[in-house]
Amino acid sequence: MAKPSPTHSGSKQLIALGKAIRELRLESEFSQEALANEIGIDRSYMGGIERGEHNVAIMNLTKIAKTLKIKTSELLAAAGL
């Protein structure tokens, strides 16, 4: 019988990334809903990203960084990754 795949929700890295995204979003004066709309995702999903509940696709990370006017590498560095 196949083992269920492990969940990444709540991992230290995802929590750190979510915290960095939230801090950068607030510094840029975006609401959660406005940032979510800019990158084409639901606000509730954006909230999950910020809480470290979702393993974010690289394309969404790139869109988030671009919208916040930073490089993706800077976003990852802000999270300590």
Predicted region positions:
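Conserved hydrophobic/aromatic packing and binding residues within compact polymer-binding modules
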Residues: 21, 35-36, 46-49, 75
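Hydrophobic micro-packing sites on short alpha-helices
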Residues: 61-65, 75-76
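Short basic helix-loop element that most often maps to the first helix and adjoining turn
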Residues: 19-34, 38, 63, 68
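A short, Lys/Arg-rich alpha-helix, primarily the initiator
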Residues: 3-26
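Short amphipathic alpha-helical segment with a characteristic S/N-K-E followed by hydrophobic residues
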Residues: 55-56, 75
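Recognition helix of helix-turn-helix/homeodomain-like DNA-binding domains
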Residues: 40-54
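Short C-terminal boundary/hinge segments that cap the last helix of small helical domains
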Residues: 69-81
